[in-house]
Amino acid sequence: MLFRSQWYNLKLSAITWLVLLPPFVALVAQTFVGWSSDRRQERRYHAVIPLALAAVLIGLAPLTQGNLVLTVLAFMLAFGGLKAYLPAFWAMPSMALTGSAAAGSIGLINSLGNLGGFFGPTVLGWVQKTTGSFVGGLYYLAVSIAVSAAILVFLPIGGT
């Protein structure tokens, strides 16, 4: 059950529209970043910059508590960054590896990503249950995303 008091006592229809905004921004951002990355033939920073933006915005999100517009804006842009990096990111393995090595690396990346899909919500839920707040979990998420961006900066893939 959704507690409307946590959503500024908005009607369910208003909440629905607010929840639809981040995926819409992500759709636009992912399309634009993918197009830009292909046009410029550059992958690394087209992946790193959206991730870094998402990390910063998720880290700042707890500071927006009490301001609906800033909170929704922070999550809209953060979700956009979390999806915008994907086209450039998925082009990178085949730039460094070929054939079965590229296929194996993509499989490994997917497997590790699926582990993140399990551990992320588990840790976030544990932090919320332990502290009574999602703030620590959001900081954990922001740091995890920032580490991912840092890894991509230093990944030895030539000239990207």
Where are these regions (language model features)?
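Multi-pass alpha-helical transporter architecture, strongest
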Residues: 142-160
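Transmembrane alpha-helical segments of major facilitator superfamily
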Residues: 18-26, 113, 144
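Short, small-residue-biased leader/transition segments that mark boundaries at the very start
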Residues: 1-2
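A membrane-interface helix-boundary motif in multi-pass transporters
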Residues: 125-144
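Helix-to-loop junctions at the C-terminal end of transmembrane segments
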Residues: 28-42, 128
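Paired intracellular helix-loop junctions of major facilitator superfamily
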Residues: 92-103, 132
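C-terminal transmembrane helical hairpin of 12-TM major facilitator-type secondary transporters
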Residues: 41-92
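Loop-to-transmembrane helix entry
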Residues: 9-24, 104-108, 136-139
